[in-house]
């Protein structure tokens, strides 16, 4: 039993390796980009809109309200990044219903990359909103003695994001694989359904935490 797709090497030339995690990640990205292009190719501003566009607008509206409730008033500025995070993680986790599929989020390399994107995005959004000086001032609030603690907090929460998502998805896959070998068929099916729900919850938690971190970084201007 493989712990993650990192152990399955598809192609190797010297030190360059193409493992299942990388291949699956690129395949998911291609599917998502193609699906997005297909879904948005005939958007209409008129009164007569296709039903699928109404559904998309409802979903986007819900996402915007969720972002605004966290504290980011200009939700459309952050929706492309935060929405992409959620969709990629959710789609990656939902595809576990495909036999033989190894979710990229079950690999620490993938979750670390996602967490690093949040680590980079937070100061970028903070600087864009408050300016370089305004953003850097948040590290010495409420007192300059908090500077090292705030830096440690930035690093530790990035690590926590990566490990939390990796641990939950990998453990779920391992438990399901074990149950398939030692229990009747019905129980693993129920666990698969629970795994899909857990995958959606993890995608929601990851994106909400990213939203909270960005909201905190953009708060300097308001203060």
Swiss-Prot record:
<keyword id="KW-0997">Cell inner membrane</keyword>
<dbReference type="Pfam" id="PF00119">
    <property type="entry name" value="ATP-synt_A"/>
</dbReference>
<dbReference type="GO" id="GO:0045259">
    <property type="term" value="C:proton-transporting ATP synthase complex"/>
</dbReference>
<keyword id="KW-1003">Cell membrane</keyword>
<feature type="transmembrane region" description="Helical">
    <location>
        <begin position="78"/>
        <end position="98"/>
    </location>
</feature>
<keyword id="KW-0406">Ion transport</keyword>
<dbReference type="InterPro" id="IPR035908">
    <property type="entry name" value="F0_ATP_A_sf"/>
</dbReference>
<keyword id="KW-0138">CF(0)</keyword>
<keyword id="KW-0813">Transport</keyword>
<dbReference type="InterPro" id="IPR045082">
    <property type="entry name" value="ATP_syn_F0_a_bact/chloroplast"/>
</dbReference>
<keyword id="KW-0812">Transmembrane</keyword>
<feature type="transmembrane region" description="Helical">
    <location>
        <begin position="174"/>
        <end position="194"/>
    </location>
</feature>
<keyword id="KW-0472">Membrane</keyword>
<keyword id="KW-1133">Transmembrane helix</keyword>
<keyword id="KW-0066">ATP synthesis</keyword>
<comment type="function">
    <text>Key component of the proton channel; it plays a direct role in the translocation of protons across the membrane.</text>
</comment>
<comment type="subunit">
    <text>F-type ATPases have 2 components, CF(1) - the catalytic core - and CF(0) - the membrane proton channel. CF(1) has five subunits: alpha(3), beta(3), gamma(1), delta(1), epsilon(1). CF(0) has four main subunits: a, b, b' and c.</text>
</comment>
<protein>
    <recommendedName>
        <fullName>ATP synthase subunit a 1</fullName>
    </recommendedName>
</protein>
<keyword id="KW-0375">Hydrogen ion transport</keyword>
<dbReference type="GO" id="GO:0005886">
    <property type="term" value="C:plasma membrane"/>
</dbReference>
<dbReference type="GO" id="GO:0046933">
    <property type="term" value="F:proton-transporting ATP synthase activity, rotational mechanism"/>
</dbReference>
<feature type="transmembrane region" description="Helical">
    <location>
        <begin position="196"/>
        <end position="216"/>
    </location>
</feature>
<dbReference type="InterPro" id="IPR000568">
    <property type="entry name" value="ATP_synth_F0_asu"/>
</dbReference>
<dbReference type="InterPro" id="IPR017692">
    <property type="entry name" value="Alt_ATP_synth_F0_Asu"/>
</dbReference>
<dbReference type="GO" id="GO:0042777">
    <property type="term" value="P:proton motive force-driven plasma membrane ATP synthesis"/>
</dbReference>
<feature type="transmembrane region" description="Helical">
    <location>
        <begin position="108"/>
        <end position="128"/>
    </location>
</feature>
<comment type="similarity">
    <text>Belongs to the ATPase A chain family.</text>
</comment>
<dbReference type="InterPro" id="IPR023011">
    <property type="entry name" value="ATP_synth_F0_asu_AS"/>
</dbReference>
<feature type="transmembrane region" description="Helical">
    <location>
        <begin position="20"/>
        <end position="40"/>
    </location>
</feature>
């Amino acid at each position: 039993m493989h712990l993650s797709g990192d152990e399955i090497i598809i192609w190797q030339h010297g030190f360059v390796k193409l493992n299942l995690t990388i291949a699956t990640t690129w395949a998911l990205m291609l599917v998502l980009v193609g699906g997005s292009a297909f879904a948005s190719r005939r958007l209409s501003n008129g009164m007569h809109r296709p039903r699928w566009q109404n559904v998309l607008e409802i979903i986007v509206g819900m996402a915007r309200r969720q972002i605004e409730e966290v504290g980011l008033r200009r939700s459309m500025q952050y929706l492309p990044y935060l929405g992409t995070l959620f969709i990629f993680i959710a789609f990656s986790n939902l595809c576990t219903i495909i036999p033989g599929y190894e979710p990229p989020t079950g690999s620490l390399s993938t979750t670390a990359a996602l967490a690093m994107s949040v680590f980079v995005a937070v100061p970028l959004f903070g600087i864009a909103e408050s300016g370089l000086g305004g953003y850097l001032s948040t590290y010495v609030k409420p007192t300059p003695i908090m500077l090292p603690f705030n830096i440690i907090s930035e690093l530790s929460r990035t690590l926590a994001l990566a490990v939390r998502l990796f641990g939950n998805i990998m453990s779920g896959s391992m438990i399901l694989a074990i149950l398939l070998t030692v229990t009747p068929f019905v129980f693993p099916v129920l666990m698969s359904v629970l795994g899909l729900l857990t995958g959606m919850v993890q995608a929601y938690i990851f994106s909400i935490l990213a939203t909270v971190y960005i909201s905190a970084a953009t708060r300097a201007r308001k203060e």
